[in-house]
Amino acid sequence: MTMPSTPDGTNPFQAAQAQAPLVIGVTGHRDIRKQDREELQTAIKDIFVELKGKYSSTPLILLSPLAEGTDRLAANVALSQQPQVRLFVPLPMRQTAYEQDFQGDSLAEFRDLLGQAEGSLELPLVKGNSSQGILRQGSERDLQYEGVGKYIVQKSQILIALWDGDETDLVGDRKSVV
């Protein structure tokens, strides 16, 4: 796996003074109810504000793969907290393949958020998956989503997990990440 880097080629996990960042991951549902959005935005912002207060000299990085729903909600809140909170985007697969998940305004929003991120990383194929197999909806693609969830858990010191109370057993969803 290659080291993550920003557009200028630096490693986003290293601050100018070589301070170790506090890495915050996010996982949750894609279909956030409209009536819950404002409350969830406030809750995520409160987490960032609290962390900035407790660790004022520590860089904060949010890891978000920018899926619709929770990932983008947290990413937008993080971007509103710049420069204290920076956004880094681990992608579950090549960007062109991942973009097949999004249409119209959603695709435009994904590209806009990715363009505002500090950097991104396309994760390698999960063992046994093929570059053609992940292009179709199904188990190979689901394993890539699970892989990005595992990456976020492994790299994060804090995990923000939003759940609507509905149980699912989907591979790569919030439940399999947490």
Residue ranges and their predicted role:
Residues 2-178:
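Acidic/glycine-enriched connector segments
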